[in-house]
């Protein structure tokens, strides 16, 4: 099989996967550090943020199919992108551990169904050979997951962790805008 460039639809879906998985990786790797060193919470409270994020991801993934059937893919990605933006805003704007933990829960709820939907959409794309769309989107998504945490670390070291997480916020906003262009 020869190399195939992504078409417009796969580029949009792949970019959304990149942003969502970069956000997942950043929250998984940096939320405890953020709570401990930026918000200045104690060692017993700091890991609760990651637990809240993970719990919301789990709940969302188990319940996502019902929402998907009710709202459709495009609307669900749009709403969940908005949730991810709102949750990260809560996390970054309010210096309270419990508000940050709530924000991380909202981010997890927002990101929870995006990856399953974009993988499904890519796998069912008829304009590319079987499996090629899924391979493209998965590659872009995992590039975000692997690329994100070290970039956040670099930005945190050179600026601050709050500034570094603003980079994730910019990607979440871009994901929200791109989700409006998904073809149904």
Segments predicted by a language model, with ranges:
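Short amphipathic helix-loop junctions that connect adjacent transmembrane helices
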Residues: 29-45
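A late C-terminal transmembrane helix in Major Facilitator Superfamily
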Residues: 127-161, 168
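Pair of pore-lining "gating" transmembrane helices in MFS-fold secondary transporters
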Residues: 7-23, 105-109
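Structural signature of the two symmetry-related core transmembrane helices
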Residues: 75-90
């Amino acid at each position: 099989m020869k190399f195939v460039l992504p078409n417009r639809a796969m580029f949009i879906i792949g970019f959304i996967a990149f942003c969502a998985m970069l956000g997942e990786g950043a929250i998984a790797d940096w939320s405890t550090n953020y709570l401990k060193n930026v918000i200045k919470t104690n060692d017993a409270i700091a890991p609760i943020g990651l637990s809240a994020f993970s719990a919301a991801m789990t709940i969302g993934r188990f319940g996502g199919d019902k929402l998907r059937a009710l709202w459709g893919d495009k609307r669900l990605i749009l709403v969940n992108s908005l949730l991810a933006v709102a949750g990260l805003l809560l996390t970054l704007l309010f210096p309270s551990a419990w508000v940050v933990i709530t924000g991380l829960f909202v981010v997890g709820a927002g990101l929870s169904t995006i990856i399953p939907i974009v993988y499904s959409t890519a796998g069912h794309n008829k304009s590319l050979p079987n499996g090629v769309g899924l391979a493209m989107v998965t590659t872009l998504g995992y590039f975000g997951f692997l690329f994100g945490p070290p970039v956040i670390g670099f930005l945190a070291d050179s600026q601050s962790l709050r500034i570094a997480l603003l980079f994730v916020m910019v990607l979440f906003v871009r994901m929200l805008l791109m989700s409006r262009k998904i073809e149904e």
